[in-house]
Amino acid sequence: MTQLHNRTAGQETNRVMTPDELEAALRAVGAERYHNLHPFHRLLHDGALTRGQVQAWALNRYHYQASIPAKDAALLSRLPTAELRREWRRRLVDHDGTEPGTGGIARWLKLAEGVGLDAAYVESREGLLPTTRFAVDAYVTFCREKPILEAIASSLTEMFSPTIIRERVSGMLANYDWVSEETLAYFKPRLTQAPRDVDFALAYVKEHARTPEQQQAVIAALRFKCDVLWSQLDALYYSYVAPGNIPPGAFVPEV
């Protein structure tokens, strides 16, 4: 496992950063902590995982995907203006869709089915790793309870997602003959949705984080979100790669 460093650009300063300096500090968080650096993702993208290990990833990731609308709805309910609510409401539509069978959650279920999982089992979330449940639920709670500025800042991992999506799609298509473009259809819309969402969230954070304390808080919020993503992969690696200690009640691959 790689070791996270405790310091990030912009982490310790008692002066107000310019908006561009703040953006640079936020991007430095991703350069150091985003989960594309995790060994599990390298194995996934390089074709080094078994079908069962990929199934474990898809199953556990579903809990994260299905919880995104919950965290967005929690934040949406606290936004003070119609303009902000309209902007944030698009995220709910992206994931929940406008009718049954549409939206990101439905596409992720198709991905899970495409790698050999039963959709009803995935939706039940019965086979989740405990760490997956704890990490994702902590993120939903963070967005429900933290100041709006910090909750919005925590979404800025999307600054880094287009790169990992391209790596994931190209790597999985090249290395797993049982994965198709249809299986990975979840990711194509995210290549346009994520940058659109970032444009709003980053502009909001740069405008409203005006004091040293606020700026450090938004950097910490992004670090927290990176930790949420990283910890999920730690659990997958420990349970399904090495040492392979699957917790009681969690999904056990057949292959």
Curated annotation (Swiss-Prot):
One term of GO molecular function: pyrroloquinoline-quinone synthase activity
Q: Which pathway does the protein contribute to?
A: Cofactor biosynthesis; pyrroloquinoline quinone biosynthesis
Keywords for the protein's UniProt record, in alphabetical order? Oxidoreductase, PQQ biosynthesis
Short name of any one Pfam family annotated for the protein: TENA_THI-4
- Gene3D superfamilies, per the entry: Heme oxygenase-like
Catalyzed reaction equations? 6-(2-amino-2-carboxyethyl)-7,8-dioxo-1,2,3,4,7,8-hexahydroquinoline-2,4-dicarboxylate + 3 O2 = pyrroloquinoline quinone + 2 H2O2 + 2 H2O + H(+)
Please name the GO terms of the biological process aspect recorded for this protein, alphabetically.
pyrroloquinoline quinone biosynthetic process; sulfur compound metabolic process
Reply yes or no: does the keyword Oxidoreductase apply: yes
Q: Where is the signal peptide?
A: none
| EC number per UniProt | 1.3.3.11
Which HAMAP family would you find in this protein's record? PQQ_syn_PqqC (MF_00654)
List the PANTHER family hit by this protein, alphabetically: 4-AMINOBENZOATE SYNTHASE, PQQC-LIKE PROTEIN
Function statement = Ring cyclization and eight-electron oxidation of 3a-(2-amino-2-carboxyethyl)-4,5-dioxo-4,5,6,7,8,9-hexahydroquinoline-7,9-dicarboxylic-acid to PQQ.
Question: Which family, according to UniProt?
Answer: Belongs to the PqqC family.
**What's the name of the protein?**
Pyrroloquinoline-quinone synthase
